């Protein structure tokens, strides 16, 4: 399992939100590139970037910062989400050196878009499923649909989606612990590797998540916990590495 630090971008700064609310944000750094360096130095092997302004605007807003991080760390796998709703945006990010793009809102509203993008950019598409009580939310979590996360995952099972980033909105940024059961269920029933997001607050959460790694949970994105110091990136990754032995 990989520990994947999250860098959420808002107005050019590195922030964390509580439950996806833009008005409830905490600034953790004015220079996201410096923040990326911090996590790389701590042993991160992959970064999760989110263009929060982009998620609400429907197009990239902090794209230049994403490119700057990709240029500085050309060998570091980076995944980016937020405002990715066109082939042009995907192509621009991949050309900039990003490894994966995360399709969220559009995956719910136009699932065929994911199918098309998997064909056009094979191996580079991740689907972001943000759910509340099992139902998928869209538009920066402003809207909750009637679509069940597991059903949508099954829809993409044969499309070549690299993985699914699964966020339990109720727990994101709230330091309440990860929803292990829902994450494992999605991995098992959906048939696509899952990266858990939302609620990984300490080593205990990580150890609980590790018990379901064999279902297809391949990583954990962590944000507020590493910024507030309740989880250490190096220690967490070392623990995950030890599980292989």
Curated annotation (Swiss-Prot):
GO cellular component: cytoplasm
Pathway annotation: Amino-acid biosynthesis; L-histidine biosynthesis; L-histidine from 5-phospho-alpha-D-ribose 1-diphosphate: step 4/9
Enzyme's top EC category: isomerase
Main localization category: cytoplasm
Alphabetical GO biological process terms: L-histidine biosynthetic process; L-tryptophan biosynthetic process
Pfam families: His_biosynth
Entry's localization field: Cytoplasm
Entry keyword Chloroplast: no
Single GO term (MF): 1-(5-phosphoribosyl)-5-[(5-phosphoribosylamino)methylideneamino]imidazole-4-carboxamide isomerase activity
NCBIfam families with a match to the protein in the record: 1-(5-phosphoribosyl)-5-[(5-phosphoribosylamino)methylideneamino]imidazole-4-carboxamide isomerase (TIGR00007), PRK13585.1 (NF010112)
Annotated family: Belongs to the HisA/HisF family.
Name used for this protein in its record: 1-(5-phosphoribosyl)-5-[(5-phosphoribosylamino)methylideneamino] imidazole-4-carboxamide isomerase
